[in-house]
Amino acid sequence: MRLSHVLLGTAAAAGVLASPTPNDYVVHERRAVLPRSWTEEKRLDKASILPMRIGLTQSNLDRGHDLLMEISDPRSSRYGQHLSVEEVHSLFAPSQETVDRVRAWLESEGIAGDRISQSSNEQFLQFDASAAEVERLLGTEYYLYTHQGSGKSHIACREYHVPHSLQRHIDYITPGIKLLEVEGVKKARSIEKRSFRSPLPPILERLTLPLSELLGNTLLCDVAITPLCISALYNITRGSKATKGNELGIFEDLGDVYSQEDLNLFFSTFAQQIPQGTHPILKAVDGAQAPTSVTNAGPESDLDFQISYPIIWPQNSILFQTDDPNYTANYNFSGFLNTFLDAIDGSYCSEISPLDPPYPNPADGGYKGQLQCGVYQPPKVLSISYGGAEADLPIAYQRRQCAEWMKLGLQGVSVVVASGDSGVEGRNGDPTPTECLGTEGKVFAPDFPATCPYLTTVGGTYLPLGADPRKDEEVAVTSFPSGGGFSNIYERADYQQQAVEDYFSRADPGYPFYESVDNSSFAENGGIYNRIGRAYPDVAAIADNVVIFNKGMPTLIGGTSAAAPVFAAILTRINEERLAVGKSTVGFVNPVLYAHPEVFNDITQGSNPGCGMQGFSAATGWDPVTGLGTPNYPALLDLFMSLP
């Protein structure tokens, strides 16, 4: 599995190195397995010049976690006292000790001080050096690697060493063990949208009445979900406030772009209180473009705005359309979300991540500007309906990104993500055709970025045939399995400890399990899931039979892509009410939600199968299929209005 490709913080080197290292040096990163699409070729010429970048460890990450829990805990006297952008940057900047010690090491090994510079965001030390110098410095060997699909070459090593005393000061070094994904090579995407389309059911296709008349009540909510159905399900009243700065942020990428014509058709049919021409505020990242023509409209973007606008109106949305059309037409990078995070946080910004699209884009028609760094303010609520398999990215990459979500939480930002549409399985390509993990493809594969403990992850439900949205319960979605389970990287969060233990006491699935952090003891003793991992989803919302307009036609759409913007829109509405009385935004909501499960509609039926198993089952209380349940807007509003 891919997670095993990178081992961080190993206590001692294994195997024999061509260049011996001092006794106090240890392996910092090692690639255990060469990806199948790459071939190791000859040693790099020792005279070759390498642009070296040393990522410095950020300060106070543990303190940041504790502080976020404190200002997010409803029992804390500091609840809601969020930090400013400047306070967050200052808190996490690499310490001067880290900078000085790493620089001193480089100079002691013959890298002259006038060759070393620090990046403008203070996160990296950088210098140019010959391959011979770097191999001696890191006790490694550099090779040329060839990508089998494209013939393109890349420079990397199998492993590298740093002094034991400096391990805690160094995040990672490039060029290092990572192999770049190659532009222009067709392959299965490791990142995907959380939605799929289906034809209108026959009952709607046969009727000759206008959809607005047909669906102007809740009688057919079991067949087609409209804004009226969502309001009935969650007791959502019509909005009346639009505080400047409280717009709902929606992330889009992979070339999925909304159509204004589709929005107008949806508004005129299902949300006539919203004027024609209403559109999100575009904040384009790295050459992205929106909107598009109706013939090229993306179902994901159309869904996100059509399902959320009726909830938040008269408030508006902000569209963070990300990456230039050249890249998004054939997204061949295993990394994801970092170019967006760069754009809203200059301190995070880096031009060297080998897993993300590089800018300026040298390709014909590519974005020729510099990588956008810190050019936009983050929204107070952000909805993300994209993701992939946790096993497809290095642990260090995911932990650095997860720490960034923590920083946004400290600033009062709520980040809501879809849990995925593959149950307990992963998706796309590696490591097996079934997308499950382990040598036999039976180990459950958790989702990315849904497992980060600083995000609010939303699973999917549907309304059974014949059910009344005003009085009948939803069940876990069945047309696809809602993503849920336990991380192989992150430990179970403190805020969910009791809820998860209660689940195991009431509805233990009986599967063999293992206990692992950072994939340290993956699949030991025949286990198929990580019992102590961060559990997800946190909550759920409607995720099937949703009516939208796409490419000018009404259609049904499903996926946890629908659930995430519904819950995000509800948080935006709650923020409106808190801001109106001088209170802060709700920020990171998970500690409050787990402390008050009574504000949810508990979902007790359904499961999320995968890997040849039944997966997990919905149960009373929290479960790894539908989380705490679906929102009851008035109860959620009363709860958050009662807090400072």
From Swiss-Prot:
Any one GO molecular function term: metal ion binding
Swiss-Prot/TrEMBL cofactor(s): Ca(2+)
Signal peptide: 1-18
Listed name of the protein: Tripeptidyl-peptidase sed1
Gene Ontology annotations of biological process type: proteolysis
Residues of this chain annotated as glycosylated in UniProt: 235, 326, 332, 519
Subcellular compartments: Secreted, Extracellular space
Cystine crosslinks: none
Co-factor note (free text): Binds 1 Ca(2+) ion per subunit.
PROSITE patterns found in the cross-reference section: SEDOLISIN
Residues annotated for Ca(2+) binding in this entry: 602-603, 621, 623
